[in-house]
A protein has these predicted regions:
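Short, surface-exposed interaction loops/tails
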Residues: 124-171
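C-terminal juxtamembrane segment of a hydrophobic transmembrane alpha-helix
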Residues: 24-41, 62
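Acidic glycine-/aspartate-rich tracts in secreted/extracellular proteins
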Residues: 89, 109-113, 159-163
Length: 171
């Protein structure tokens, strides 16, 4: 007599697959909004950290340069913050004789996390949220920051509100 073995079936039924898909859909609908909120909070935190760093370095520049702020064109201000400077604010490569101050920021200005720009718009006047234009360009560089050579104030060149409520340009 022949021995008949039952074939075992492997795999999942259609119902089992559908149940798993429904469960994954429910999980995704509850988890994805939390990731979106985390992204907004991370952008705000990055913006606050960048502004804090730049403000403290501008304060250090002012202290080391006898009360004078970075000044001149956008290129001059960026160079005064990212290169070595002399007491008069002239910029040169770090290590150049006679240029004992700075660099205050390593490399280049940080990118604004909301518009991606790392250029700086320099105003010889006080600045406010009315100066914000997130589409502003300086040649091929997007403007991420607005700086006043009068007050030393620096703000984000971003419209809208932070996740915590205040206007981005007022952080």
């Amino acid at each position: 007599m022949r021995n008949l073995k039952k074939k075992s079936r492997r795999g999942f039924t259609l119902i089992e697959v559908l149940i798993v898909v429904v469960i994954l859909g429910i999980l995704a609908s509850t988890v994805l909004p939390q990731f979106a909120a985390s992204t907004a909070n991370a952008k705000e935190s990055a913006l606050r950290a960048d502004l804090s760093q730049m403000r403290s370095q501008i304060g250090l520049y002012r202290f080391q340069h006898d009360g004078n702020l970075p000044s001149g064109t956008a290129t001059n201000v960026a160079n005064q913050l990212t290169m070595a400077t002399d007491i008069n604010g002239n910029a040169a490569q770090p290590g150049t004789a006679g240029y004992a101050y700075g660099p205050y920021l390593i490399g280049q200005l940080p990118a604004n996390p909301y518009n991606g720009g790392n250029g700086i718009l320099v105003k010889a006047a006080n600045i406010s949220s009315a100066d914000v234009d997130p589409t502003a360009m300086q040649g091929t560089v997007k403007v991420g920051w607005i700086f006043s050579t009068v007050s030393g104030q620096i703000i984000a060149n971003s419209l809208g509100n932070a996740a915590s409520g205040p206007a981005l340009s007022s952080l």
